[in-house]
Design a protein with these regions (language model features):
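A short C-terminal helix-loop "cap" of Rossmann-like NAD(P)-dependent dehydrogenase/epimerase domains
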Residues: 20-33, 89-92, 125
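Conserved beta-loop-beta element that borders a ligand/cofactor-binding pocket
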Residues: 1-10
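Substrate-positioning beta->alpha
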Residues: 14-20, 33-56, 63-64
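Mid/C-terminal beta-alpha module of Rossmann-like enzyme folds, strongest
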Residues: 54-113, 124, 129-130, 146, ...
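Residue-level signal for the nucleotide or nucleotide-sugar donor/cofactor binding architecture
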Residues: 43, 71-74, 122, 135-138
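Glycine/small-residue-rich pyrophosphate-binding loop that anchors the diphosphate of NDP-sugar donors
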Residues: 39, 116-119
Length: 178
């Protein structure tokens, strides 16, 4: 099974986790790699399960690989905006070249240069040939609300990564336009 980026209410899809949402709530800018327009497929865990469970033990799946992803592929700008909207604020985005992020933080950069900086859109036709009723129905906007609501339910879940927070301050200062 090839799920790509599957998430649940506990997973903020930005390095530093809750840090990006907390920054937005504080009126601070957040870093989005590149120009923010690369497409990224985020799949809600419940949608993944709808594709995965019917494949279990199915004779046509033995020894074969299947993508199980959403058909929705928002841009990274849209992902940030959905989280901001769910948090009741506006996203203030500063675009930073992926290479610059990688130079400043090799761990963050590895996930960008090897993956997230490139558009990722998947074809689920093979999955649908075995599970024709598969449809991902949970858009990231709904998932973003679940993420924010879950974190808001218990303040101990709102963990800010001080290293990523400071790095974002540094990158924002360097790459802010205007």
């Amino acid at each position: 099974m090839r799920p790509s980026h599957t998430y649940d209410r506990t997973l903020v899809p930005f390095d530093g986790g809750w840090t990006a949402v907390e920054r937005m709530r504080q009126g601070k800018e957040i870093v989005v790699h590149g120009d923010g327009t690369s497409l990224w497929t985020l799949t809600h865990h419940a949608d993944f399960a709808k594709g995965f469970v019917p494949l279990l033990g199915h004779p046509r799946t033995i020894g074969d690989a299947f993508h199980i992803t959403s058909d929705d592929a928002p841009t990274w700008n849209q992902i940030a905006e959905a989280l901001a909207f769910a948090a009741g604020v506006e996203a203030r985005i500063v675009h930073v070249p992926s290479d610059a992020i990688a130079a400043a933080d090799p761990d963050w950069g590895a996930g960008l240069l090897g993956d997230k900086a490139h558009s990722m859109v998947f074809d689920n036709s093979k999955l649908r040939s075995v599970v024709p009723e598969f449809t991902a129905t949970i858009p990231f906007e709904q998932g973003a609300r679940e993420i924010v609501d879950w974190h808001d339910e218990d303040p101990t879940r709102k963990r800010v990564d001080p290293r990523i927070d400071a790095l974002m301050d540094q990158l924002v200062e360097t790459y802010r336009v205007g």
